[in-house]
Amino acid sequence: MDAYQQVKDKLEELGIEFDVVEHPPAFTTEQADSYIEGLEGVRTKSMFLTNKKKTQYYLLIMDDQKPLDMDDFKEQVEANRIRMASADSLAEKMQLPPGTVSPFGLLNNEEKDIRVYFDKDIVSEEIMTFHPNTNEKTIFIKTQDLFRFLESIGFSYQILTLP
C-alpha cells in the first residue's frame, strides 16, 4: 500500500472528511504553498526534532511562515538540546523521507515514542494543510478531525505558545 493510501484509508475508516490537491513534488513550504494558493486552510510546517542523545523525539506543527525559536521550544518541553532529527531517524521512526513530515507519519510510529506539539496560533484555525506522507499531494483537514485522528492512533498532543 502506498503512503497516501494508508492515510486515506485511516481517515475514511474514522469517517473524517478531507480534501486533497495533487501537484508536482514540493520540496519547500514555499513550493507547496504555491500549489494550493487561494484555497482555505492554514499552511503548516511539521518539524521532526530530537534531543542530542536521540532518546526523545518531537513533532512540532506550526504556521509555515513563523520561525521557530529553538531555545524557547526546548525550555517549554524541558529538554537540554534540541535539533532537527536526521533523515535516518525520520526513516526509522516514521518511515518517511525528508520533505514529507506531517502528523500522518505517526501512523508508522509503532513505538508511540514521539511527542506531538502544536503552536497555539494555529489550533483556532478551522482547516490545516499537510502532506499526507507524500510531497505530491496536500491534504486539507479540519483541525478537530486531525486531533481525533491523532487520538485514534494512540497519540496525545500538547499546545504550546510559541513566540
Question: What are the language-model segments listed below?
Answer:
Residues 1-163:
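Extended, low-hydrophobicity, polar/charged segments
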